[in-house]
């Protein structure tokens, strides 16, 4: 993979987390495989490639790529507005998080505890999802900037759905961090749209 493709895997994962959070908010549904991929990305240490963070297969990120492409194409009929809003908010929150070494330390130790829960219960167990959601509440939710997720209140008010959404936002922010570590910048979304789209078309065609 080229450096740009590596970046797009991580950025596609930010959008994937946003798409899944939006889906839960609107329908109350999310596939176990999708949830597993994003939760698993929080716990991967020392991956060989960026794709290894997401199960080694970018089919896991296809909905995120689709949402990212529609955002870069600026096609009003295809644009997924809420996922785009959530994605940009996650990228912004990651910048704030980067200035908080104390919070990053807390997150690292809490994720170690969650890894132990995963070994005991499995990746998509309610206890693991609740722990990830709780970690988001105790850290990212304390920033002044908040992500307001819009959807059907019948689904948003269910504690399990709320925990899933928070866990996905946490995974999205982790992916935004990876994207930036790989050289990603917000200005690329404005000034390098053509290059990003060409690379994305190639990635989604294969």
Swiss-Prot record:
It comes from the Bacteria. Keywords: Cell inner membrane, Cell membrane, Cytoplasm, Membrane. The keyword Nucleotide-binding does not apply. Its main location: cytoplasm. Gene3D superfamilies: HflD-like. It is a peripheral membrane protein. It is found in: Cytoplasm; Cell inner membrane. One of its GO terms (cellular component) is cytoplasm. NCBIfam families: PRK00218.1-2, PRK00218.1-3. Belongs to the HflD family. HAMAP family: HflD_protein. This is High frequency lysogenization protein HflD homolog. It comes from Ectopseudomonas mendocina (strain ymp).
């Amino acid at each position: 993979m080229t450096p740009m493709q590596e970046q797009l895997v991580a950025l596609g994962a930010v959008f994937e987390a946003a798409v899944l959070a939006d889906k839960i908010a609107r329908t109350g549904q999310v596939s176990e495989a999708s949830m597993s991929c994003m939760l698993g990305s929080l716990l991967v240490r020392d991956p060989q490639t960026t794709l290894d963070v997401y199960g080694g297969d970018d089919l896991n990120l296809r909905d995120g790529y689709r949402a990212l492409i529609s955002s870069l194409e600026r096609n009003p009929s295809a644009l997924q507005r809420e996922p785009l809003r959530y994605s940009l908010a996650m990228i912004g929150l990651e910048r704030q998080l980067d200035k908080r070494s104390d919070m990053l330390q807390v997150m690292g130790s809490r994720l170690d505890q969650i890894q132990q829960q995963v070994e005991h219960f499995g990746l998509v167990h309610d206890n693991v999802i609740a722990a990830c959601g709780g970690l988001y509440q105790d850290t990212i939710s304390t920033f002044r900037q908040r992500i307001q997720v819009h959807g059907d209140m019948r689904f948003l008010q269910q504690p399990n759905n709320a925990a899933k959404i928070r866990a996905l936002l946490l995974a999205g922010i982790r992916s935004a961090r990876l994207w930036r570590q790989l050289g990603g910048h917000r200005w690329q979304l404005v000034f390098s749209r053509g290059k990003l789209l060409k690379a994305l078309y190639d990635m989604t065609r294969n």
